[in-house]
């Protein structure tokens, strides 16, 4: 079907629905994949979003970046792997399901619901959200293998995870140990460091007196009073000076450097000792009456290099059951790991008086008890950064528990060396942020005391405590002596019922009841998505991955877990290139949250502007690695760009459809291409080259901004303006066809370049414009190869056109100064510059300047020849020298030719004034030169020169000016009648004899411009009549459609 005239306005929802239906009905995505099957492989791994709700703006941004880049790679000929992933296990989903089922604790889950039912509900919830989120991503136009995703609850995927744990065990990197770890009392499970969010929190800040003897105390500061029942020691730094300080009849032992800050100027230092001298000093536990077990324990001062002087007293409360550093130093000194707190954060019987209290609720009771015993020096509050559970937002606590760990500390060096093989965008993401995280990494707590997750494949013998790590479903079936799997279902509680026989003692082996940290789930995605080691061929084809991208929080999340798991399982990094992107924030830079009421949903944006506008905006707004502040007004600007693009498309199809333009019908050498035609072809290819480079480097902001500026500035505001009059030529004129061909080529190249970013509108334009003009072209724009031609780029022409556009803008400013309308022609414009490139550009593109500046003649020069130079005396230098001779010298200079005076100074270095035979010699500093333009000349400057515009209104100029004013009024009347572009009209004008005489010579010009078959000044009223005023002339214009051609 030939090119059809496009809809007059841009309707994104209509376009996007039509295009997505077209893709689905014609199976375009699968056919694009088939088309690229023989191309070089490009392997991409999708960071799996949680199936815990609907997508948000950040999730949309993430998938849009991925989709745009992968569409680009596909059009570059690559066979792209774009399998989506789904993270389906863990606390994010468990919490949502708990809310649905109305349960509040693990006890409720086990007693009221049952693990089997709870796990089933979690799976259903994940599946439902996966379907919803898939639909949302598809609405954004994201092309991925939605029918073949990797899902972390898939048995084949879980099996790869089991294999990874077996590899860790084989390498002696799997460890069960008692350690102090971060713990969520609400979820009753261990947390990894990556699962902790930090926020400001108010806590008690208390100074506690630990009794030594008599009225002497060790002064200790803490913000966690609830950990005092577990205190086993006080740590001091061996090299700090510690003071015995008297205040109010009591002696306090604390760091000398902090005495004045804590106790004030009134405190008196009695003596000072080194911290090392305090080692072994015993004290009585301040809560030994409330927590009786402490009466049977010895408490003493120990030494630790972790003690600082930045805050507190330099004497650090040490509870090995509640702090990682406390635990480590406690091991050195053989301190008991006393932890009187259960999994729910409630004090046990060992906590004495505080038994049954939630730890944070006990803070006030502990403070009151200390105060009543005169063991509290001061109680305040402090605001500080504190860790919260990433899902339920409960403040974390530290507990000593037995957990399973991966020995990351033993593979840290290998991880760092593998990191050097990865390209990071931006580079500092890997070189500083991620490297620092790895360098400070601790062993990874991988066990979770929950239900919906990959069961840890570790069976422990009930008799001899030996372990066996199962690496596959087949291995489990083979080793099982009791219980059996239901198909390949290896979730809890089914897998818990499988009993193995101990290979060492023949005893019964039961699975450890924990599930894996969900970061293990996603950390093994690189091979689990390929079902390795079960399916080795896929793995060899696609691993390792060429590209991944996620937000900057994943430096301690997915980027880290993949690298750690990759080194453990395969001795290498699973990815080669990483783009770390930012977060989406509101206009003020705040995190979006329902509580702030500042959440922008992707659907809201799509409803208002469509998916393509959202896609373009998110890539255009800022550098991808920076946080994105979502600004509705900026979105409007992007929407405006799409409307401008559509208007250009409407312009093109309106005239091309009228003339049944087919690019293949004409030999290029037969067409009359102008400089502006060659320029637009060069510009669009320059833009395509820059976009190619930008997308190759994942600089989406540069790519989109190049496209935006081209559409708005080059294509719409400039090229369409340059060729508009040529499209009105009625015959198959070579000049008009050259404009058509150039505009067609520019639009085709543009939509190919834009299509990875805004696939819907580009597909829609392609189907009409390109498929209409070239019926044998591929069925979808996304089947085209990437279009860019370096040979078509003419850098010199582009530079010259840039100069000419500045010249034309300067001409417009000069007209504004003279209040001289642009529709009125001027007699002459002189372009003045000392830069040869400027003059060369003006000469080369003189025709463009003449047409766009509406000038009869264009001249170029290094100076304006008609400028009058006026010489005046400089009072600052001549006043003191001339005194009474000043007035006659002034008159002589005024009478002299300023240009001659200036020439004399330049050639001879001075100018002589004859005062009745007396010669006065004037130096260059003695004379000031001013310039004066001739009447009717106005000038304006531009970078590189000036323009001088002659605004004299000759009869010929006035005749043409009035004719153009008449054309404008008739065009407005055509619009009022909503006439088609090609419609002919008859025009009758009632005016004064003077106006008729002035415009009669321009009759043919007016008729051509307004498509009039006849223009009559013998007035007859036609169908549509309107009164107008042009300058001081009152007119009546009447028009009607004409049947004449």
Curated annotation (Swiss-Prot):
Coiled coil: none annotated. Its main location: cytoplasm. Its EC number is 6.1.1.5. A motif ('KMSKS' region) lies at residues 591-595. Its cofactor is Zn(2+). It is an enzyme of class 6 (ligase). IleRS has two distinct active sites: one for aminoacylation and one for editing. The misactivated valine is translocated from the active site to the editing site, which sterically excludes the correctly activated isoleucine. The single editing site contains two valyl binding pockets, one specific for each substrate (Val-AMP or Val-tRNA(Ile)). Monomer. This is Isoleucine--tRNA ligase. It comes from Methanothermobacter marburgensis (strain ATCC BAA-927 / DSM 2133 / JCM 14651 / NBRC 100331 / OCM 82 / Marburg). The gene is ileS.
């Amino acid at each position: 079907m030939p090119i059809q005239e496009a809809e007059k306005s841009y309707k994104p929802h209509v376009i996007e629905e039509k295009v997505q239906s077209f893709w689905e009905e014609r199976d375009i995505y699968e056919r694009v994949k088939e088309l690229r099957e023989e191309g070089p492989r490009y392997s991409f791994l999708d960071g799996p979003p949680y199936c815990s709700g609907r997508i948000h703006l950040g999730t949309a941004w993430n998938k849009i970046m991925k989709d745009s880049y992968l569409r680009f790679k596909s059009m570059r000929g690559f066979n792209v792997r774009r399998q989506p992933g789904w993270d389906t296990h863990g606390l994010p989903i468990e919490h949502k399901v708990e809310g649905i089922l109305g349960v509040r604790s693990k006890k409720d889950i086990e007693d009221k619901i049952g693990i089997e039912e709870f796990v089933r509900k979690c799976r259903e919830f994940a599946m439902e959200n996966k379907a919803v989120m898939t639909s949302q991503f598809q609405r954004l136009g994201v092309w991925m293998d939605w029918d073949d995703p990797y899902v972390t609850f898939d048995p084949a995927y879980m099996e790869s995870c089991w294999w990874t744990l077996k590899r860790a065990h084989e390498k002696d990197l799997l460890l069960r140990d008692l350690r102090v770890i971060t713990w969520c009392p609400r979820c009753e499970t261990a947390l990894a460091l990556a699962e902790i969010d930090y926020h400001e929190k108010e806590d008690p800040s208390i100074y506690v007196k630990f009794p030594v003897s008599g009225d002497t105390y060790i002064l200790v500061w803490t913000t966690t009073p609830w950990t005092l029942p577990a205190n086993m020691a006080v740590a001091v730094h061996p090299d700090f000076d510690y003071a015995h300080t008297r205040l109010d009849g009591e002696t306090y032992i604390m760091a000398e450097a902090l005495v004045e800050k804590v106790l004030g100027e009134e405190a008196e230092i009695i003596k000072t000792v080194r911290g090392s001298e305090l080692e072994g000093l015993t004290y009585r536990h301040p809560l030994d009456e409330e927590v009786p077990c402490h009466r049977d324990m010895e408490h003493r001062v120990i030494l630790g290099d972790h003690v600082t002087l930045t805050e507190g007293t330099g004497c650090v409360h040490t509870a090995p059951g509640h702090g990682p550093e406390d635990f480590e130093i406690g091991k050195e000194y053989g301190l008991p790991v006393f932890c009187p707190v259960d999994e729910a954060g409630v004090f046990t019987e060992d906590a004495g008086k505080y038994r049954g209290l939630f730890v944070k609720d006990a803070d006030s009771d502990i403070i009151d008890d200390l105060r009543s015993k005169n063991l509290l020096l001061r109680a305040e509050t402090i605001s500080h950064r504190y860790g919260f559970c990433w899902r339920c937002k409960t403040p974390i606590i530290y507990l000593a528990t037995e957990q399973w760990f991966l020995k990351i500390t033993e593979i840290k060096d290998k991880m760092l060396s593998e990191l050097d093989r990865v390209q990071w965008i931006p580079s500092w993401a890997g070189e500083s942020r991620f490297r620092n995280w790895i360098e400070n990494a601790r062993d990874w707590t991988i066990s979770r005391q929950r239900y919906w997750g990959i069961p840890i494949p570790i069976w422990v013998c009930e008799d001899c405590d030996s372990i066996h790590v199962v690496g596959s479903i087949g291995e489990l079936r083979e080793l099982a002596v009791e219980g059996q799997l239901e198909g390949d279902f290896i979730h809890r509680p089914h897998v818990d019922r499988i009993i193995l026989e101990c290979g060492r003692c023949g005893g019964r082996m039961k699975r450890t009841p924990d599930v894996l940290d969900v970061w293990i789930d996603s950390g093994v995605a690189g091979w689990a998505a390929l079902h390795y080691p079960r399916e080795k061929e896929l793995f060899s084809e696609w691993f390792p991955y060429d590209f991944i991208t996620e937000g900057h929080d994943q430096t301690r999340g997915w980027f880290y877990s993949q690298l750690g798991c990759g080194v453990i399982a395969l001795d290498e990094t699973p990815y080669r290139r990483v783009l770390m992107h930012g977060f989406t924030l509101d206009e003020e830079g705040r995190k979006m949250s329902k509580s702030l009421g500042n959440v922008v949903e992707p659907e809201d944006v799509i409803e208002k502007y469509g998916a393509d506008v959202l896609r373009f905006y998110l890539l255009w707004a800022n550098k991808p690695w920076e946080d994105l502040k979502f600004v509705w007004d900026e979105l409007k600007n992007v929407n405006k760009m799409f409307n401008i693009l559509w208007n250009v498309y409407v312009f093109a199809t309106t005239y091309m459809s009228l003339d049944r333009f087919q690019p293949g019908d004409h030999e290029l050498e037969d067409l009359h291409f102008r400089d502006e035609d060659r320029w637009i072809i060069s510009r669009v290819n320059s833009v395509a080259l820059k976009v190619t480079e930008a997308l190759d480097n994942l600089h989406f902001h540069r790519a989109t901004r190049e496209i935006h500026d081209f559409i708005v500035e080059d294509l719409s505001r400039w090229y369409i303006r340059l060729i508009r009059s040529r499209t009105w030529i009625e015959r198959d004129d070579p000049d008009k066809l050259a404009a058509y061909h150039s505009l067609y080529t520019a639009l085709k190249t543009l939509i190919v370049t834009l299509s990875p970013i805004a696939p819907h509108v580009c597909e829609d334009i392609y189907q009409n414009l390109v498929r209409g003009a070239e019926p044998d072209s591929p069925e979808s724009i996304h089947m085209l190869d990437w279009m860019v031609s370096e040979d078509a780029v003419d850098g010199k022409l582009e530079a010259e056109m840039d100069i000419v556009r500045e010249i034309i803008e300067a001409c417009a400013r000069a007209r504004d100064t003279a209040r001289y309308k642009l529709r009125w022609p001027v007699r002459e414009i002189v372009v003045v510059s000392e830069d040869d490139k400027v003059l060369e550009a003006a000469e080369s593109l003189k025709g463009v300047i003449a047409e766009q500046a509406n000038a009869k003649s264009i001249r170029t020069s290094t100076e304006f020849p008609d400028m009058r130079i006026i010489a005046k005396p400089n009072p600052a230098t001549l006043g003191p020298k001339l005194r009474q001779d000043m007035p006659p010298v002034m008159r002589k200079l005024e009478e002299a030719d300023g240009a001659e005076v200036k020439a004399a100074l330049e050639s001879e270095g001075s100018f002589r004034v004859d005062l009745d035979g007396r010669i006065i010699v004037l130096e260059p500093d003695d004379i000031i030169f001013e310039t004066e333009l001739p009447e009717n000349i106005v000038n304006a400057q531009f970078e590189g020169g000036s323009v001088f515009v002659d605004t004299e209104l000759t009869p010929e100029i006035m005749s043409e000016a009035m004719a153009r004013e008449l054309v404008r009024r008739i065009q407005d009347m055509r619009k009022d009648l909503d006439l088609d572009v090609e419609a002919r009209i008859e025009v009758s004008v009632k005016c004064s004899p003077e106006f008729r005489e002035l415009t009669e010579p321009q009759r043919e010009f007016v008729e051509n411009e307004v498509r009039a078959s006849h223009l009559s000044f013998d007035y007859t009223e036609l169908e549509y009549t309107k009164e107008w005023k042009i300058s001081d002339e009152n007119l009546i214009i009447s028009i009607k459609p004409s049947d004449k051609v």
